[in-house]
Amino acid sequence: MITVYFIGTGGGAPNKRGLPAIMVRREGFDALFDCGEGTQWRMMEHNLSFMKIKLIGITHMHGDHVLGLPGMIETMGMYSRKESLLLMGPKELKEFLEDIFKKTYFYPNFEIQIIDKYEDENIKISTFETCHTIESQGYLFEEKDRLKIDIDKLRKEGIKDWRIIRMLKEGKRVEINGKVLLPEDYLIVKKGIRIAYTGDTGPCEKVINAVKDVDLLIHDSTFIDEKEAYKYGHSNSYDAAYVALKANVKRLALFHISPRYDDTYEMLIKAKRIFEKTFVAEPLSYYIIRQKE
């Protein structure tokens, strides 16, 4: 199971929706994507601990996506964080943080590692290029596929010995009464959950190709008017829905809503005409995705 917390879902200037910040949680692994101004305060409102964050990914260096990061790291230090923090982001991120820490006389008392991608036995996190006015990258959070034993099939064949089941799960051949059991005949692939977050982007083929078949696409939907969206390297809800449709995603969350819109009804209706399984990412809400069979 993966839970996506929409901490801040607005864009541009500070507003009631909050500035961009999304946390993805899987079995104790918390990853934060973007860290707009006020993120740590909104996390406290959400009863989420920023001390437990293991990885932070920044999409680009516009202030509404990154200005909350130095303060959060400084607070982690004040609270005596010991665990290393993994950072992903544009090439300017390292210099940006070093400069602020130097000028504010802050010296991190925990390790900060800047990495290009992340992978462990359960998940992998990678980036893809988006179409914004400056260098910008989206993020893919992917749960790895798992192998599951088809217990029902084994029971139908009268096999209940847990030692045999374990050997098959380990990929070993088993012989019983002259019959050879092959692991591939009893293993089911349990598909991992895949989530994509675009950050700021206009609609483009490179994003469509990067997010194909994901379970949840969190896509820029800043404006209603397309001319204004394209002028500033953003998308409208129609664009986001078109990307979702072309990429064959399962669900679409409209994100990075301009503070000029108090009511998102028109935005949502326009998107749902193209891609029905669309919702507006509301601030301080969460979305749960369970692993597929």
Curated annotation (Swiss-Prot):
One Gene Ontology term of the molecular function aspect: 3'-tRNA processing endoribonuclease activity
Record InterPro entries: Metallo-B-lactamas, RibonucZ/Hydroxyglut_hydro, RNase_Z/BN
UniProt function note: Zinc phosphodiesterase, which displays some tRNA 3'-processing endonuclease activity. Probably involved in tRNA maturation, by removing a 3'-trailer from precursor tRNA.
Cofactor: record remark: Binds 2 Zn(2+) ions.
Binding residue positions for Zn(2+) 1: H60, H62, H132, D200
Enzyme class, UniProt record, top EC level: hydrolase
The protein's name in its UniProt record: Ribonuclease Z
Cofactor: Zn(2+)
Lineage: Archaea, Thermoproteota, Thermoprotei, Sulfolobales, Sulfolobaceae
Keyword Amino-acid biosynthesis appears in the UniProt entry: no
